[in-house]
UniProtKB/Swiss-Prot annotation:
Expressed by the venom gland. This is Potassium channel toxin alpha-KTx 1.18. It is found in: Secreted. Disulfide bonds join C7-C28, C13-C33, C17-C35. Blocks high conductance calcium-activated potassium channels. The record marks Y36 as: Aromatic residue of the functional dyad. Its main location: secreted. The record marks K27 as: Basic residue of the functional dyad.
């Protein structure tokens, strides 16, 4: 799932993904965070 959180590196997505989908598995893709529930 792609969330509307800007990023430059994947670790910036981990806490945002934790909030959004409940897991901290995420990557920065195309300047947005992609989370893996």
């Amino acid at each position: 799932i792609v969330i509307d959180v800007p990023c430059t590196v994947s670790k910036e997505c981990w806490s945002a993904c934790k909030k959004a989908v409940g897991t901290d598995r995420g990557k920065c893709m195309g300047k947005k965070c992609k989370c893996y529930p």
